[in-house]
């Protein structure tokens, strides 16, 4: 079953920079730290990985490096989103070529296609690349919201296997579970509501917070997957302020600030994202302390 392969806590990895370039040494160390922390998969070059400000060459290199470093220990779901269908196909083909286990394709942004346009976008990728494809729905960033009716149609295609749902709307998951069938993989894209998402039948979370706290995020998700809700609630209470603190400024700047405090990478981000504002740093540090990180 696809669900047995893609589940649990799956960090949306940051892309570390140093002196304006991708810091490959730091990236490899981040991958190793996540795997040692017990995560169940990895997502390179997603939103948190600043894919929109990576060159195509950098994007491809980060995917290759993630696959090589992971060496099959956990599945790699490579970011392959674009508002150009042809470009998304190209990125998905590259992900398959270098050995990624799946790709994550955000709904087309800026050009704001209709529901039929989104269906045809994903169908074209499905037809072009034999690789598991996750739909990524994040209307707060893209300006479009893929409907459950469209997802039901997409679920009938052989390579469209599931969704990363970053809407935070927990009512959607029950309908998706009923409409898309038992093989449909449902991954939350919202750390703060992941507990509820799992209780509604979800299979995991593509997590920002795991960049900072992989051990705690893994413990939380293991509890949820085992139906140990009291234990899951313990970890939820310990992590919830950190979940929120990592979005007190434009992401991933707060996450990189937190990681820099742990000596994991620099704070460097690429414009138009700027370094985490001084005014929110104390709240991030306090949330880290509450999560047992300082």
Curated annotation (Swiss-Prot):
Gene Ontology MF term list: 4-hydroxy-tetrahydrodipicolinate synthase activity
Annotated source species: Caulobacter vibrioides (strain ATCC 19089 / CIP 103742 / CB 15) (Caulobacter crescentus)
SUPFAM superfamilies per UniProt: Aldolase
GO cellular component: cytosol
Amino-acid biosynthesis listed as a keyword: yes
Protein's pathway: Amino-acid biosynthesis; L-lysine biosynthesis via DAP pathway; (S)-tetrahydrodipicolinate from L-aspartate: step 3/4
InterPro entries: Aldolase_TIM, DapA, DapA-like, Schiff_base-form_aldolases_AS
Keywords tagged on the record: Amino-acid biosynthesis, Cytoplasm, Diaminopimelate biosynthesis, Lyase, Lysine biosynthesis, Schiff base
Transmembrane keyword on record: no
Intracellular or extracellular location(s): Cytoplasm
Binding-site residues, pyruvate: 48, 206
Active site (UniProt): 136 (proton donor/acceptor), 164 (schiff-base intermediate with substrate)
Designated gene of the protein: dapA
Family listed: Belongs to the DapA family.
Pfam families linked: DHDPS (PF00701)
Protein name according to UniProt: 4-hydroxy-tetrahydrodipicolinate synthase
Reactions listed under catalytic activity: L-aspartate 4-semialdehyde + pyruvate = (2S,4S)-4-hydroxy-2,3,4,5-tetrahydrodipicolinate + H2O + H(+)
């Amino acid at each position: 079953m696809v669900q047995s392969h893609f589940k649990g806590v799956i960090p949306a990895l940051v892309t570390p920079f140093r002196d304006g370039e991708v810091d490959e040494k730091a990236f490899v160390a981040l991958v190793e730290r996540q795997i040692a922390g017990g995560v169940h998969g990895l997502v390179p070059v997603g939103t948190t990985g600043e894919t929109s400000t990576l060159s195509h060459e950098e994007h491809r290199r980060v995917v290759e490096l993630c696959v090589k470093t992971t060496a099959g220990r956990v599945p790699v779901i490579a970011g392959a989103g674009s508002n150009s269908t042809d470009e998304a196909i190209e990125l998905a083909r590259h992900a398959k070529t270098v050995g990624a286990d799946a790709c994550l394709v955000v709904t087309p942004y800026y050009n704001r296609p209709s529901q039929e346009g989104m269906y045809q976008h994903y169908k074209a990728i499905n037809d072009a690349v034999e690789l598991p494809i996750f739909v990524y729905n994040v209307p707060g960033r893209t300006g479009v919201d893929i409907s459950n009716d469209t997802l039901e149609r997409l679920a009938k295609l052989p390579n469209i296997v599931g969704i990363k749902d970053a809407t935070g709307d927990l009512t959607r998951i029950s309908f998706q579970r009923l409409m898309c069938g038992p093989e449909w993989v449902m991954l939350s894209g919202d750390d703060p509501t992941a507990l509820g998402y799992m209780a509604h039948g979800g299979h995991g979370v593509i997590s920002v917070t795991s960049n900072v706290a992989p051990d705690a995020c893994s413990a939380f998700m293991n509890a949820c997957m085992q139906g140990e809700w009291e234990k899951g609630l313990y970890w939820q209470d310990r992590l919830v302020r950190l979940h929120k603190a990592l979005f007190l400024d434009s992401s991933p700047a707060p996450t990189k600030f937190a990681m820099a405090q742990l000596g994991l990478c620099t704070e460097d981000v690429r414009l138009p994202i700027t370094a985490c504002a001084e005014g929110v740093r104390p709240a991030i540090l306090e949330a880290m302390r509450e999560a047992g990180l300082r």
